[in-house]
């Protein structure tokens, strides 16, 4: 398949100081893990050189050490939402070092769509499979979706982490759907346990995907 493969370090090097990143996943499940770990290393090097380096991080829920923990320890977070539990992150918030909005998880995608946090410069999504369909990639999420469809649609550029630990058949577990926002929201049309209202993948224009970390 014709996409640009890159290392996590190469992907992280594309992200600039001050940019906003929206990520896949819900808790550590489904969160991209490699790129943010390298981004923390970049932040440490930039700070040691006397340069500012911080990014905004928006997710569906808590992440894990490689995102909330490593970036907090690297003094690399300019703003964070929503709810999160990582102990290193909590420590830095309670020291007054990180502007933090303990937003209810269910509001994160909607508030990004409203534009409350500015532009979404990057989406970083963990996926288990990628299909090329016309001018788009259909990407299949791993263990959790979170705000992935909103992140991918709003982002100017997208990095995919193709996690081979997950069986490609995991792509059948998701029903990807974005509701309308208030005041136009309608009832979510699920009435029976087998109902499906969305798609099993997130569709992303090829020209937005700058690289795939494998």
Question: PLM features: what roles do these ranges have?
Answer:
Residues 1-214:
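Conserved alpha/beta enzyme-core scaffold
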